[in-house]
């Protein structure tokens, strides 16, 4: 997760075992991304949308808030820019599925989406892009298994990366908790055997799954399997498979 999958970064880590040198390489890669974005869009809007991904994920909002990054713009006014970013394969996009069912593509809301970096190692560097490596607390926290809720979106990004690498289009679902008037969110939805599989992601060992439970109650007849991806051991909790994040690539 820290090094990522970029060949230069992986090679540097194997040769030096030095995260600082790896981070320098990843900063160079991000600079190349910025240069390419400027060629695609000389106004710099793509660069701004890209740089804001960590902040947008950190808000826990139900969508990427375009207006918070580009004044006067909305999601439906930057669809072409978003498409250019996705085509560059530097980011992954997850769409809100308004009516989660087997045909997720038919339920996607083009105006409600989240953006993830295609490489989580680059995300770890982008978060602290404007600071010195010594101020990048993600390395220390991940190595000591103390990544807090405030950086939980790093795990959400790695899940997005893994699912995308397995060939899945990315969807999520947000719905209202009628009692608290706050939103529940299913982080990812998969389509399988004419059913859907909801996935909730936890950045810690906590095995509570309120969103999964509420989703199951609402859409029980549509669900095939339920997953909670977290940092502890493989186990079952009723009909929910508690899956360590490192086993996610092997999920069938």
Regions found by a protein language model. Give the residues of each.
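Generic recognition of short, well-ordered alpha-helical interface segments
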Residues: 1, 21-25, 41-44, 80, ...
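Interdomain motor-coupling "hinge/lid" segment immediately C-terminal to the ATP-binding subdomain
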Residues: 1-58
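Alpha-helix boundary recognition
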Residues: 2, 54, 83-86, 164
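Conserved phosphate/pyrophosphate-binding and hydrolysis machinery centered on Walker-type P-loop NTPases
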Residues: 16-19, 38-43, 68-75, 149, ...
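A short, surface-exposed helix-loop junction/capping segment
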Residues: 29-33, 58-66, 134-147
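Phosphate-coordinating catalytic segments in nucleotide- and nucleic-acid-processing enzymes
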Residues: 39, 59-60, 75-76, 92-96
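A cross-kingdom feature that marks ATP-driven nucleic-acid transaction machinery
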Residues: 86-252
